Amino acid sequence: MAPNIRKSHPLLKMINNSLIDLPTPPNISAWWNFGSLLGICLMTQIITGLLLAAHYTADSTLAFTSVSHTCRNVQYGWLLRNLHANGASLFFICIYLHIGRGLYYGSYLYKETWNTGVILLLTLMATAFVGYVLPWGQMSFWGATVITNLFSAVPYIGQALVEWAWGGFSVDNPTLTRFFALHFLLPFLIASLTLVHLTFLHESGSNNPLGIPSDCDKIPFHPYFSIKDILGLALMLFPLMTLALFMPNLLGDPENFTPANPLVTPPHIKPEWYFLFAYAILRSIPNKLGGVLALAASVLILFLTPLLHKSKQRTMTFRPLSQLIFWILVANLLILTWVGSQPVEHPFIIIGQLASFTYFTTILILFPMISTLENKLLNY
């Protein structure tokens, strides 16, 4: 019998082992769909971004006009822009759900896969931040000014670091051109890191909702999960197209329809919705360096989760107390997101401080404590 080219060809063999004959646990739920959705998001963003870059001018005097020109005069330019801007929002929705799944089902115990995933998240956040600056509207300009200024909190080298990042003494043309270069480059770094992420994942195989080994009972990825992923894609495309076609500016900031003006500060500078939780943590600490450290810790804390796992069970499926704490953490993040969008005044300041404190307490103290308690209750 002739060898199957799918299994013998050096390149096709890799695709086959990743997408066709990949042994997969039979009981993984829809929460396992988000990995493939993130891959599709990345491809969509790269394609729409490439087409937008063909019409964009990375110059502080022309950037705003070139984006306007793309929307008005380029065939389907408005659609490209709306898909790219709202695709970023969907990308973050998917990655947050993907991370939530990982926390709930103990996927972080695959340490290499988890750590590369956190690095992917950090790269994605950097990409989204530099991308938000490119339209050169008011919020783009002032967002860039505020966030890059945080580097000045680094002792001794802070000021030099900021001026080096800016390419001058303020956010100006050199800043815009280098941000465009970075925004073009980073998605390809994300794509290569994704391959590393998948390499580590396929080394161990997927986790499953029960958190038990499933080697004795696996099924091929295709057709079972390829069909399931296509359904997930259809369900994801629906909100994306609804958003891009009917409410394209729902998640944007009205300030960004005004060209950047260094002489006029917007009344309330805030990032896109997907960074608001971290922004709220940054603002809740009245000290600049402390705020920057808390901001970094809010995401870097994910690296610690494998070390904080004290339960004898992998997933939270049969741990109701841990489930309660998990959903409290989710609610807490939603509160932080809401507070981050509000002005810095009385009720919001204290709510933000309490929510920030609760965020770190939940992850660092409550999860390990509750897990240990559950072990005792279950006589482990």
From Swiss-Prot:
Component of the ubiquinol-cytochrome c reductase complex (complex III or cytochrome b-c1 complex) that is part of the mitochondrial respiratory chain. The b-c1 complex mediates electron transfer from ubiquinol to cytochrome c. Contributes to the generation of a proton gradient across the mitochondrial membrane that is then used for ATP synthesis. Heme b b562 binds at H84, H183. Heme 1 (or BL or b562) is low-potential and absorbs at about 562 nm, and heme 2 (or BH or b566) is high-potential and absorbs at about 566 nm. Heme b b566 binds at H98, H197. Keywords: Electron transport, Heme, Iron, Membrane, Metal-binding, Mitochondrion, Mitochondrion inner membrane, Respiratory chain, Transmembrane, Transmembrane helix, Transport, Ubiquinone. It comes from Asio flammeus (Short-eared owl). One of its GO terms (molecular function) is metal ion binding. One of its GO terms (cellular component) is mitochondrial inner membrane. SUPFAM superfamilies: a domain/subunit of cytochrome bc1 complex (Ubiquinol-cytochrome c reductase) (SSF81648), Transmembrane di-heme cytochromes (SSF81342). Binds 2 heme b groups non-covalently. This is Cytochrome b. A ubiquinone binds at H202. InterPro entries: Cyt_b/b6_C, Cyt_b/b6_C_sf, Cyt_b/b6_N, Cytb/b6-like_sf, Cytochrome_b, Cytochrome_b_C_euk/bac, Cytochrome_b_N_euk/bac, Di-haem_cyt_TM.
